[in-house]
Amino acid sequence: MLDCRAVIMLWLLPWVTQGLAVPRSSSPDWAQCQQLSRNLCMLAWNAHAPAGHMNLLREEEDEETKNNVPRIQCEDGCDPQGLKDNSQFCLQRIRQGLAFYKHLLDSDIFKGEPALLPDSPMEQLHTSLLGLSQLLQPEDHPRETQQMPSLSSSQQWQRPLLRSKILRSLQAFLAIAARVFAHGAATLTEPLVPTA
């Protein structure tokens, strides 16, 4: 009869032969998240081409607007020690942010634009946002429901300004998320090391 260690080693054999890290039930594939978030950053920058004077326009945000926009903050546990202790708080905040921006990209603000044609930077951004969101969704949890911003119908003249503001905010959010995933990929992915 096989002892317990032999059974565990047989169970881990497929990952050892492929040189993969042993999957954890609560942790994402940090390397894949790093790659997707890096790709998302590039897509967000490509989707928001500078438009001269529009970049100089700074709209003052009221308190309600500031509170609705997801931001990764210190208390979210996205710092190196917070990720090491329990990455779920940080990953939940990133999932919420991705869902928020996906909701905005699905709104009438971005509808009917030539930039949303298949294979356009905006469509690729939308698809990649969805891909990273799905990768971060815990397998044992159904899709989380969260409060989405209530969007009133925008006027045609408002859309370029709103698009620019949303994409700038998304760029900032994705830059921080990419740093989180880069740290996670470098330090939290533990390769399988056989014990003697």
Curated annotation (Swiss-Prot):
Coiled coil: none
Any one Gene Ontology molecular-function term assigned to this protein's record: interleukin-23 receptor binding
Gene disruption phenotype: Mice have no overt phenotype but display compromised humoral and delayed-type hypersensitivity responses. They also have impaired secretion of IL17 and IL17F, higher susceptibility to Klebsiella pneumoniae and Citrobacter rodentium infection, do not develop experimentally-induced autoimmune encephalitis a mouse model of multiple sclerosis, collagen-induced arthritis a rodent model of rheumatoid arthritis and also spontaneous colitis induced by IL10 deficiency a rodent model of inflammatory bowel disease.
BP GO annotations: cell surface receptor signaling pathway via JAK-STAT; defense response to Gram-negative bacterium; defense response to virus; inflammatory response; innate immune response; negative regulation of interleukin-10 production; positive regulation of activated T cell proliferation; positive regulation of defense response to virus by host
Tissue expression per record: Secreted by activated dendritic cells (at protein level). Detected in various tissues with higher expression in polarized Th1 cells and activated macrophages.
Compartments in which it is found: Secreted
Signal peptide: 1-21
Inducing stimuli: Up-regulated in trigeminal glanglia after herpes simplex virus type 1 infection, in the lung of mice infected with mycobacteria or Klebsiella pneumoniae. Up-regulated in microglia by combined LPS and IFNG stimulation. Up-regulated by FASLG.
Entry keyword set: Antiviral defense, Cytokine, Disulfide bond, Immunity, Inflammatory response, Innate immunity, Secreted, Signal, Tissue remodeling
Pfam hit, one: IL23
Main location: secreted
InterPro entries assigned: 4_helix_cytokine-like_core, IL-23_alpha
GO CC, one annotated term: interleukin-23 complex
Gene3D superfamilies noted in UniProt: 1.20.1250.10
Subunit structure: Heterodimer with IL12B; disulfide-linked. The heterodimer is known as interleukin IL-23. Interacts with IL23R; this interaction enables recruitment of IL12RB1.
Family (UniProt): Belongs to the IL-6 superfamily.
Role according to the record: Associates with IL12B to form the IL-23 interleukin, a heterodimeric cytokine which functions in innate and adaptive immunity. IL-23 may constitute with IL-17 an acute response to infection in peripheral tissues. IL-23 binds to a heterodimeric receptor complex composed of IL12RB1 and IL23R, activates the Jak-Stat signaling cascade, stimulates memory rather than naive T-cells and promotes production of pro-inflammatory cytokines. IL-23 induces autoimmune inflammation and thus may be responsible for autoimmune inflammatory diseases and may be important for tumorigenesis. Associates with IL12B to form the pro-inflammatory cytokine IL-23 that plays different roles in innate and adaptive immunity. Released by antigen-presenting cells such as dendritic cells or macrophages, binds to a heterodimeric receptor complex composed of IL12RB1 and IL23R to activate JAK2 and TYK2 which then phosphorylate the receptor to form a docking site leading to the phosphorylation of STAT3 and STAT4. This process leads to activation of several pathways including p38 MAPK or NF-kappa-B and promotes the production of pro-inflammatory cytokines such as interleukin-17A/IL17A.
UniProt protein name: Interleukin-23 subunit alpha
Record organism: Mus musculus (Mouse)
